[in-house]
Regions:
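Substrate-binding/catalytic cleft of secreted carbohydrate-active enzymes
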Residues: 1-195, 202-208
Length: 208
């Protein structure tokens, strides 16, 4: 893959793993994979999407031992979806054990487009929007975060998502439905990005 795609300008990072369990054999294999990646392409940084953190109350410490081998740490953080309630997320604080740049490689929640209800009712657009709202507050508080990639733009087919009447073999975490209809969370994320862009523009104007 690296040999095929290393001249593509769209490739920013090489990711060598996604949510791998923490044990010695994994650390040995992945560290060798990082070395091979750098041998094949010395011009790009190497990352991995991790989901191992130690927890101390509302504090999450990024201390996966494999994080010492990569250049940029990716974190898959599904607060409010795979753990906790949406309003827990804004109270979470994060620490990075080794000071490396961090990207939130996945975050989000599922919703069936057109399904409405209370903000605490799973699979509704309101619940997905609440997860995004509180996660975006959490991200604002993570000063060492250098980027995010919400999971995911559009619903897609998934044979592992059989829940009848809701999933029907689709992954429903998209900000858009499978037919491209925007869900409520899409507008929240757009406003977040617009706010970030305006803030950056103001910083640039100060430097000028």
């Amino acid at each position: 893959m690296i040999g095929r795609d290393k001249n593509r300008a769209a490739i920013v990072l090489w990711s060598v793993a996604n949510e791998t369990p923490n044990h010695d054999a994994r650390l040995s294999f992945l560290s060798r994979l990082v070395d091979k990646t750098r041998e094949l392409d010395s011009t790009r940084l190497v990352t991995a999407a991790l989901d191992t953190q130690s927890r101390q109350g509302n504090v999450r410490v990024i201390d996966d031992p494999f994080s010492t081998h990569v250049d940029v740490i990716g974190i898959n953080a599904y607060c409010g979806w795979y753990g906790g309630a949406p309003d827990d997320c804004a109270r979470w604080t994060w620490e990075s054990a080794n000071g490396k740049p961090v990207i939130i490689s996945e975050f989000g929640a599922g919703a069936l487009q057109g399904r409405h209800g209370a903000a605490n009712e799973r699979w509704t657009e309101e619940y997905q929007a609440a997860v995004y709202e509180h996660n975006l507050t959490m991200l604002d508080n993570m000063r060492f975060v250098r980027g995010t990639t919400p999971w995911i733009l559009k619903d897609f087919r998934s044979p592992r998502r059989p829940l009848p009447g809701i999933q029907d073999f689709w992954n429903r975490k998209g900000l858009l439905s499978d037919s491209g209809v925007r869900k409520q969370a899409w507008y929240l994320l757009r406003a977040f990005y617009e706010r970030k862009a305006l803030s950056q523009q103001r910083e640039n104007d100060k430097e000028d």
